[in-house]
């Protein structure tokens, strides 16, 4: 196979690795990780995967070592990388909420805002972005790279930290408090470079891949619902559906049955309302109600 028919895809190693593999599985791609290998197998001969830390992904995509990859908005900013963002994919190791980079200090610290950081030592993995943030506030402070366990460094090893958090639980567990608003809010992004995206075959492959990933994300937390209803009861059944804003992409699909007095109705709903809406539909006259899983929704 020629290299022009292979898309070099970077997958984030570390905390997002399993969540990324699960997203790809829902999109129709099976990724298999082998012990000590940084080249996971995928059931698509046109994709060649490489495991790379999300922190480094932007520069490898930017310089063409990889055609595309998944990384965080934070690492694009940290590397000041010139990449093309094809999609925002909101997922993480814990939830589908964005992560935030925050300034945190010990609970009893006198630091209350950026100006109080003058001359202080700050530990973070987001060094360059933090320096730019401080400069924007006209503050001069010492920013040191942290290799990990950043939460334990104040107050002995650092006066403050800039750390990523999803729930804030780790910061609270280490007796730290957040100062002010987040420095940066970040979500995963699917990125490429201008050269790869100018290649018609690679562009089509990436666009198709992004479409399927978005479809998998759109289907998360949703299920399909089918039911039969007498035409005479249709208004009551539709009224139940209209009471729940989490039903259907547009409007339920109605199909005739062999019995002219009955129709089949199909809709998409949020999974968390199934237990509420099914009894209501039954009471309104619906019969033969069943729920089914949805893997992808492409609008």
Regions found by a protein language model. Give the residues of each.
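Small-molecule-sensing regulatory modules
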Residues: 2-46, 51, 71-100, 108-299
């Amino acid at each position: 196979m020629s290299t022009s028919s292979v898309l070099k895809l970077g997958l984030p190693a570390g905390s997002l690795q399993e969540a990324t593999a699960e997203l790809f599985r829902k999109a129709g791609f099976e990724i298999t990780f082998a012990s000590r290998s940084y080249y996971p197998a995928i059931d698509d001969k046109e994709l060649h995967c490489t495991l790379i830390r999300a922190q480094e992904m932007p520069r490898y995509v930017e310089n063409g070592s990889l055609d595309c990859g998944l990384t965080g908005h934070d690492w694009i900013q940290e590397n000041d990388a010139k990449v093309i963002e094809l999609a925002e994919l909101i997922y993480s190791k814990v939830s589908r909420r964005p992560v935030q980079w925050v300034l945190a200090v010990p609970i009893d610290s006198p630091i209350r805002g950026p100006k109080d950081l003058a001359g202080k030592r700050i530990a973070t993995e987001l060094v360059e972005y933090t320096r730019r943030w401080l400069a924007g506030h006209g503050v001069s402070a010492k920013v040191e790279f942290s290799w990990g366990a950043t939460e334990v460094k104040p107050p002995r090893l650092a006066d403050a930290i800039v750390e990523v958090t999803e729930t804030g639980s780790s910061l609270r567990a280490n007796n730290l408090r957040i100062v002010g608003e987040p420095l940066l809010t970040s979500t995963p992004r699917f990125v490429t470079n201008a050269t790869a995206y100018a290649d018609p075959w690679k562009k089509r492959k990436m666009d198709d891949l992004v479409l399927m990933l978005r479809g998998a994300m759109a289907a998360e937390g949703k299920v399909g619902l089918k039911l039969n209803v007498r035409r005479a009861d249709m208004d009551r059944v539709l009224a139940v559906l209209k009471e729940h804003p989490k039903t259907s992409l547009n409007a339920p699909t109605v199909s005739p049955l062999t019995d002219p007095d009955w129709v089949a109705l199909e809709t998409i709903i949020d999974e968390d309302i199934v237990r509420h809406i099914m009894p209501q539909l039954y009471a309104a006259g619906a019969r033969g109600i069943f729920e089914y899983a949805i893997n992808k929704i492409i609008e």
